[in-house]
């Protein structure tokens, strides 16, 4: 399937069937598009809020934040630790996990925009060392109930929530949680239905830093096992785990 934009429309074209599967009318203020092939919905942000667009071009409101410094559905943690987006569709398309970031406590830092004719100053929130950092939470929006469940990630609030992944049955969400010192990582499983923590599967530590870059990857023929990519021994290797956090074997 080829995805492309033209004249403020987004199209999904199927080469095998030689036809357009979906055509969405876009607004100039929308960004951060995330298409779900399972249900044909398109997640996007409008300002600092998250929306969804159905195949019949009906817009649904996921968040309606009005306070300054609250951002939903966008990439967080300065795009570190493999983070490049802020929305995560469940495999079957029944739910949408997303980041909510509160950066109201973070001071502004004057970045310079050099793409303008004359360079202009553009303040952005940037957490300086030793000062307050932003606080991130993860919501799970159910398309049927139109309600959001928040994962109970707990304290400390300044930890990094990285590498979000869904279980194949859509019942659980896996998150690599990293402390602000970046030297201790916990792979944690949460219930996508209640938000409760289900298990702390394993921990990685390093005297210098731990840098998770990839979410868990489930085996297509075994939903009870996943591959974890790590540099825990100083080299980039793959490890096979079961969903209870037991290391089955080192693959590379």
Label each region the model flagged:
Residues 21-25, 59-67, 149-152, 197-203, ...:
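Beta-propeller fold detector
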Residues 15-18, 54-57, 142-146, 192-194, ...:
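Short loop/turn segments that connect beta-strands within beta-propeller blades
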Residues 30-34, 162, 211-216:
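Repeated scaffold domains used in trafficking and secretory/extracellular systems
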